[in-house]
């Protein structure tokens, strides 16, 4: 590193993947987090600090914060899923859980887990990102509210970033607005007043700055390498600015805070930068008779691993199918795509599907979180670490997941069904993302929102309505069947249906129809099949598989 200017920014992933899209529990307020921060430091032997064990967090969350055990585990496991672990480590954990024969055995294994205490406190604090502010609600909109007006379709407009989890302006504003609180949360108790505030002489430990690297990273202007915050803060030429003392191995609270505020800038790998200066991808074609043009942008040509991003909007009335290096390990946002069939058959880091209608999404394994918001009549087929849904209507989820699907607020007529497809590289992609076939909690969703805890918000697909899904593309690879197979009830339904078809074929064969009768029968069957294609929407899917005219073909990734 030379003496050039330091640039810092707020990392996107903790917010995209780590901030649950609901208002946090009231006990996650700063007041309680400060109390937890002090409490855990008195429990070093019991697993409170510097690593927080699941058993200690369960005691705090359930005993002191009055959270349900399932909710306490949800936040603990969400944070743990952000940790840098190899796919092999994740697969090993799945194997351990799949061998457990009871809830007590599962709990015994969970008790072996621990997370970084200070980073976990920061993680709990950023849940405030989606806190509903009455004041903001009152002053933030015109009255009457112009909700009936169509939103701007332009991807580059801020209107496309209503989801705070994907809005890097919101990430930066949150950290800047709460920077003092974040630093105070990391202070040793003796550095705080009785009211849990810093003083002019408060000192910040190196461990605290290492923890803050969970949210902030940076570089030196003119360099390509990205450094965690603590490496830059400890860089010798910056000691005067950051307030680091070699003698005490601590930072001056106020000098460090001032330096952070001076250096914080926009995320060069965030959504805004991707939309403004990212590479435009010609993956979709213009549909005749439509005015909206599909927009797909990525930053994978400049972004390091873990910072890759693909944003796709306004894909309309077509089939889009990709297996591309551009998608591998990327955070993907799919926005306002309607009446389409979208196949993204690569290992993905996270996926957010927002404001889409009447579409089918077939995804490669999603290593962290798959989230749907404000979607209508959408079918999603995926292997994912976690699924969460909010404000959806009439959506079907064919999933394989090692965690309970999260039903957040505003959902209606949700259907869960077993994962029912495969493509040749699927098992290889699952291994690369650390996702196994067991345990699989597709049929055990968790209703997280308070507004509607009724189980009637969702149903499990009846076996009589179940069909397998065929991916109509040729690829290289070894997977030839659905990973993990199908639940017995669904396999039985398929077998019974197959038997009925065989009986019907035998009946037709033995009917000894004349040549004219066979022709009439063939026409009748074809007409009925054509009606079925139209009524089920499969006709549109077949039509969209026909390659577009030359000049508007999908480009390679």
Curated annotation (Swiss-Prot):
PROSITE patterns: C_CAP_COFACTOR_C (PS51329). Residues 290-435 form the C-CAP/cofactor C-like domain. Keywords: Cytoplasm, Cytoskeleton. Belongs to the TBCC family. SMART domains: CARP. It is found in: Cytoplasm, Cytoskeleton, Microtubule organizing center, Centrosome; Cytoplasm, Cytoskeleton, Spindle pole. This is TBCC domain-containing protein 1. GO terms for biological process: maintenance of centrosome location; maintenance of Golgi location; regulation of cell migration; regulation of cell shape. SUPFAM superfamilies: C-terminal domain of adenylylcyclase associated protein. GO terms for cellular component: cytoplasm; spindle pole centrosome. Its main location: cytoplasm. Plays a role in the regulation of centrosome and Golgi apparatus positioning, with consequences on cell shape and cell migration. It comes from the Eukaryota. Pfam families: TBCC (PF07986).
